[in-house]
Design a protein with these regions (language model features):
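Alpha-helical interaction segments
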Residues: 2-4, 41, 61-68, 78
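A secondary-structure boundary/capping signal
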Residues: 6, 49-52, 87
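PIN-domain endoribonuclease scaffold, especially VapC-family toxins
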Residues: 27-41, 46
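N-terminal, well-ordered alpha-helical segments
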Residues: 32-35, 54, 74
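Arg/Lys-rich, positively charged N-terminal/basic patches that mediate binding to nucleic acids
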Residues: 1-33
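A short, surface-exposed loop/turn module that caps and links secondary-structure elements
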Residues: 41-64
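Enriched for short, Lys/Arg-rich terminal
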Residues: 64-92
């Protein structure tokens, strides 16, 4: 289950469906990814074809990333069976 968001626009999108805080053309894919993340109990549950799940390094060590589109990524970490600090970023 998703416990916390780092990106406020992503949190609004997840709770209301409003796309104001995200790239509108990413809405469909983000919706699928957020629903999957909300059901996930470990990072491996997000290892779906085309999502390119991978662990992050450096300052984001302990976080995971899945590809949304181009350079955009959905990043998160798991504490127990819950996802937290869910972020939507262009970090490349």
């Amino acid at each position: 289950m998703i416990k916390t968001f780092k990106h406020k626009g992503l949190e609004v999108f997840f709770t209301t469906g409003k796309t104001k805080g995200i790239q509108a053309d990413h809405a469909r894919r983000l919706s699928r990814q957020l629903l999957a993340l909300n059901d996930a109990t470990q990072a491996a549950d997000m290892d779906l074809p085309g999502w390119r799940l991978h662990p992050l390094k450096g300052e984001l060590a302990g976080h995971w990333s899945v590809r949304v589109s181009g350079n955009w990524r959905l990043t998160f970490r798991f504490i127990g069976e819950d996802a937290e600090l869910v972020d939507y970023q262009d970090y490349h």
